[in-house]
């Protein structure tokens, strides 16, 4: 009797694991598709900007509203 219960629980557990794994693969694909559609393009050096994160170089001179190249020592 105990062995039968253990086997039934094991089969149910394995079935549930397979079902959730299949759903995760589909969910991951949908998330990747959604993220690729939401990806924003950055502004190249010399382009207009109002925030640092708009620029590919991550440096925006807000006084002139232009993306500048960053120079590191």
Swiss-Prot record:
The modification Pyrrolidone carboxylic acid is found at residue 41. The keyword Transmembrane does not apply. Residues 1-22 form the signal peptide. Disulfide bonds join 42-56, 49-60, 55-67. It is found in: Secreted. It comes from the Eukaryota. Residues 23-40 form a propeptide. InterPro entries: Conotoxin. Belongs to the conotoxin O1 superfamily. The presence of a 'disulfide through disulfide knot' structurally defines this protein as a knottin. This is Conotoxin ArMKLT2-022. It comes from Conus arenatus.
């Amino acid at each position: 009797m105990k062995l039968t219960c253990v086997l039934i629980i094991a089969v149910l557990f394995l079935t549930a694991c397979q079902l959730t794994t299949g759903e995760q693969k589909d969910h991951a694909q949908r998330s990747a598709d959604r993220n690729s559609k939401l990806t924003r393009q950055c502004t190249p050096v010399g382009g207009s900007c109002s925030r640092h994160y708009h620029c590919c170089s991550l440096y925006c001179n807000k006084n002139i509203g232009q993306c500048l190249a960053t120079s590191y020592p």
